[in-house]
Amino acid sequence: MSTKPKNAAHLSESAQVDSGSVQPFTRSQKIYVQGSRPDIRVPMREVTLDVTPTDFGGEINAPVTVYDTSGPYTDPNVIIDVRKGLADVRSPWIDSRNDTERLPGLSSHFGQQRLSDAELTALRFAHVRNPRRAKAGANVSQMHYARQGIITAEMEYVAIRENMKLQEARAAGLLTQQHAGHSFGASIPKEITAEFVREEIARGRAIIPANINHVELEPMIIGRNFLVKINGNIGNSALGSSIEEEVAKLTWGIRWGSDTVMDLSTGKHIHETREWIIRNSPVPIGTVPIYQALEKVGGAAEDLTWELFRDTLIEQAEQGVDYFTIHAGVLLRYVPLTAKRVTGIVSRGGSIMAKWCLAHHQENFLYTHFEDICEIMKAYDVSFSLGDGLRPGSIADANDAAQFGELETLGELTKIAWKHDLQTMIEGPGHVPMQLIKENMDKQLECCDEAPFYTLGPLTTDIAPGYDHITSGIGAAMIGWFGCAMLCYVTPKEHLGLPNKDDVKTGIITYKIAAHAADLAKGHPGAQIRDNALSKARFEFRWEDQFNLGLDPDTARSYHDETLPKDSAKVAHFCSMCGPKFCSMKITQEVREYAANQRIEAVDVDVARGLAEQAERFKQEGSQLYKKV
């Protein structure tokens, strides 16, 4: 059977970047903060603000720095060509450690087969580098370096990134007020330092997913003592999609704030598509290797073997995948516990491994070969994302014996991974009513010794198809506050169909709101800067600043235009809901002006004097209770 792509849209020569993903944000500029060496340049987005109107004091408002996941795509000084991929960021750092070697070619059998297939030439990414691997006996994981007391360039990079110029913001008066947080036992410092990052990684409380073969990566960190992160999912299906479409899904997602991206492809040309995605991704890429392994055996779970899965791990590690979801906690003895569930096993990876276990009546080969998996992953610094194959698919099944039994096993596997100095996070539910969410977080912290938790929502009710980004956003905000480190987004199409670009954006913005709300509640240093700046802009009727400081400036601006479309409305001193006579903020401004004119402090208006003035006016007008108007 020919593997040649039939659709011309698949061809590499036609691939172009998505135009919507490369537009700079209005009144924003990409800035880079340099670290201790010239090649540590940490990207951020700086939002320029208007001067406060003269009526409100006329002061200059300092620019606000915000976290930026969009990579070079929103930098007008960078020429983007998806056919060449992004610039190499990390090779000098990796070279300086002198513990890796460049292989003469791909070492996975499947990778070699794909490379030798001439019919795939038109589809293949043209600028593939030979992969790196740890030298014999070496461990190249960030956790290994951290436990040796080494602060890597990646650790310094994420420390700078997490702070977002916090010292400068304080000096500019952008953080005059921040409410104290309640962190539920997290140890969040007033400022993130590179040494703190090293300590957290060494302890296992945080990870920097950073495969040595993903040199285009802009490093980021996942951990309960850092900013809450979000993940977005992409991937082709059996129906197929073009290279251009898959890269567009990536760039669109990171534009709106996706900190990592999981490629869940199940269709044709998975290997080639993944190469394009990684070469064009500034954020960590995660996969579920069992999906591709299943494709290799024609979808028959019972035909899976350790040897085939091992080759798939090597194939993906050599491409540069940063973290693997491994469903090693789905044990044979747990499968019967799901029999009386309302929704059974809803995890695709979990159901694959459950079917394999039952077909062979043997223990999960991902569990029995777990240390072999560790040996592969530490040679490339691929992080574990230990999959929750028995997560609840309905609130009726939340916190049951199957779910928590698997979680306890994931805790055991975490300790084995840590023995190999492997970075590890734990995946969680799913569907959980609000009153049971904290129990999930507490149980995970206990079983997995504070390894980062990564959850899908959770959805807090099952009655809202079409609105599951909201049902899950509620749970995501709660579990993020309780200590969850990364939240996997849910779109409005969850359970219903494949999301389009608008759905993806809606899901990401919903989860950015949840993550930020959790950061505020935890008391992350500087989390309130953006809120304070936007609130000040709102009170001063600086409309453009309100739009530009928001998570989604385009939608905010379009909603305002629906009511007040003229440019003059963008400087109006009233809001679009109440109009000029009933705007509460306009009235408050008038009260302040009155107080100032009467030489009365706005914060301590002389109420008695005001009452006396009104009483005298009542008498002068005839002391009539009612007057004709």
UniProtKB/Swiss-Prot annotation:
Enzyme class, UniProt record, top EC level: lyase
UniProt-recorded Gene Ontology molecular function terms: 4 iron, 4 sulfur cluster binding; carbon-carbon lyase activity; zinc ion binding
Keywords: 4Fe-4S, Iron, Iron-sulfur, Lyase, Metal-binding, S-adenosyl-L-methionine, Thiamine biosynthesis, Zinc
Binding of Zn(2+), residues: H431, H495
Origin: domain of life: Bacteria
Catalytic activities: 5-amino-1-(5-phospho-beta-D-ribosyl)imidazole + S-adenosyl-L-methionine = 4-amino-2-methyl-5-(phosphooxymethyl)pyrimidine + CO + 5'-deoxyadenosine + formate + L-methionine + 3 H(+)
Chain residue ranges for the region called Disordered: 1-24
InterPro entries recorded: ThiC (IPR037509), ThiC-associated_dom (IPR025747), ThiC/Bza_core_dom (IPR038521), ThiC/BzaA/B (IPR002817)
Cellular component per GO, a single term: cytosol
Residues annotated for [4Fe-4S] cluster binding in this entry: C575, C578, C583
Name the record gives this protein: Phosphomethylpyrimidine synthase
Native organism: Pseudomonas syringae pv. tomato (strain ATCC BAA-871 / DC3000)
Gene name of the record: thiC
